[in-house]
């Protein structure tokens, strides 16, 4: 039997003091899904301001919903959106399924939308945290959502974006603070120097990842040193994709600064962990390697998903 999916749509125009943002929303009947298209300019992609997200709603809604915004990794290999051609990764697909079961609205953000980005284009990735903040500020005005219970999570590249919330540069761009964040398998080789913030955090790492543990161990200690409440959990015997069949392969990865990570400071300067000043160009040269991870059987991915949702449940109050 052929399935017919019906869409309804409407437009919003949001004005600020010197600009406007056209927001288009499409509702997918019978799927408890909405899609939103909005603008988040990135200087790396002039004229390609559109970003989209797919919002998954619980079947039964009682009161205002807590919201998880999910940022995909470099490979959007898990789920194609119902409209507009957006995609997310496999962990995002499972987070959406588990999250709505637990009563969350789960927002799958596609920050690569129509930008022609391939997983190997590490130097061209957008500053996706900006899109997440724009989206949060939009959704915070929607009366269906509890603007005091917004959570941010991501995998790999997305996990690195989530950790940027500990930078004072990005933390100050939302009217109400994020409740908590989860960074699943971030690289931690190039990070923001953190400030002390109220956001609760969890870093999940595979012990056999090609994004080797020492980098995230160092950054976790730094986050705690400045006063943040952040946990680090490792899953034994699994690689970057939470698989048990992991090996080291060939492909671009930001893992060349494992033992001396690069930090960006609030004033825009860069230093390595040992205090040596550096530049963006040197960081790119030293930190990007051709040593990637292989193996996507994902036997332990559901464990990482459960860790994520359980952590948010703990702080969902």
Report each predicted region and the residues it spans.
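C-terminal catalytic histidine-bearing segment of alpha/beta-hydrolase fold enzymes
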Residues: 229-317
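Alpha/beta-hydrolase fold nucleophile elbow
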Residues: 144-156
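Short substrate-entry loop that stabilizes the transition state in hydrolases
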Residues: 61-65, 70-117, 209-213
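Short beta-strand/loop motif that positions the catalytic acidic residue
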Residues: 197, 203-205
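Short glycine-enriched nucleophile-adjacent loop
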Residues: 159-172
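Alpha/beta-hydrolase active-site loop
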Residues: 91, 95, 121-143, 164
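N-terminal cap/lid segment of alpha/beta-hydrolase-fold proteins
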Residues: 23-63
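A conserved short beta-strand
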Residues: 172-187
């Amino acid at each position: 039997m052929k399935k017919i999916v019906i869409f309804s749509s409407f437009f919003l125009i949001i004005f600020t003091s010197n600009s406007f943002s056209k927001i288009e929303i499409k509702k997918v009947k019978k799927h408890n899904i909405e899609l939103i298209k909005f603008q988040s300019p990135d200087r790396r992609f002039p004229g390609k301001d559109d970003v989209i997200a797919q919002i998954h709603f619980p079947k039964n809604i009682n009161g205002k919903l807590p919201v998880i915004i999910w940022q995909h990794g470099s490979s959007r290999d898990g789920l194609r959106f119902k409209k507009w051609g957006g995609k997310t990764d496999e962990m995002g697909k499972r987070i959406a399924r588990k999250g709505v079961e637990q009563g969350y609205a789960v927002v799958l953000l596609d920050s690569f939308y129509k930008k022609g980005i391939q997983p190997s284009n590490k130097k061209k990735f957008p500053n996706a945290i900006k899109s997440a903040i724009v989206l949060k500020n939009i959704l915070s005005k929607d009366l269906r959502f509890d603007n005091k219970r917004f959570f941010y999570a991501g995998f790999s590249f997305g996990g690195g974006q989530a950790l940027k919330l500990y930078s004072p540069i990005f933390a100050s761009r939302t009217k109400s603070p994020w409740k908590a964040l989860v960074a699943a398998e971030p690289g931690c080789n190039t990070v923001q120097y953190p400030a002390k913030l109220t956001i609760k955090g969890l870093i999940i790492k595979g012990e056999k990842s090609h994004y080797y543990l020492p980098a995230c161990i160092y950054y976790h200690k730094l986050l705690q040193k400045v006063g943040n409440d952040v946990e680090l959990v490792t899953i034994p015997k699994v690689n970057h994709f939470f698989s048990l069949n992991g090996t080291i392969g060939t492909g671009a990865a930001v893992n060349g600064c494992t033992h001396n990570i690069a930090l960006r400071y609030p004033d825009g300067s860069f230093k390595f962990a040992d205090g040596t000043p550096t530049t963006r160009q040197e960081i790119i040269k030293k930190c990007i390697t051709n040593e990637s991870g292989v193996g996507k059987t994902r036997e332990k991915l559901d464990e990482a998903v459960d860790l994520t949702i359980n952590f948010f449940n703990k702080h969902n109050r």
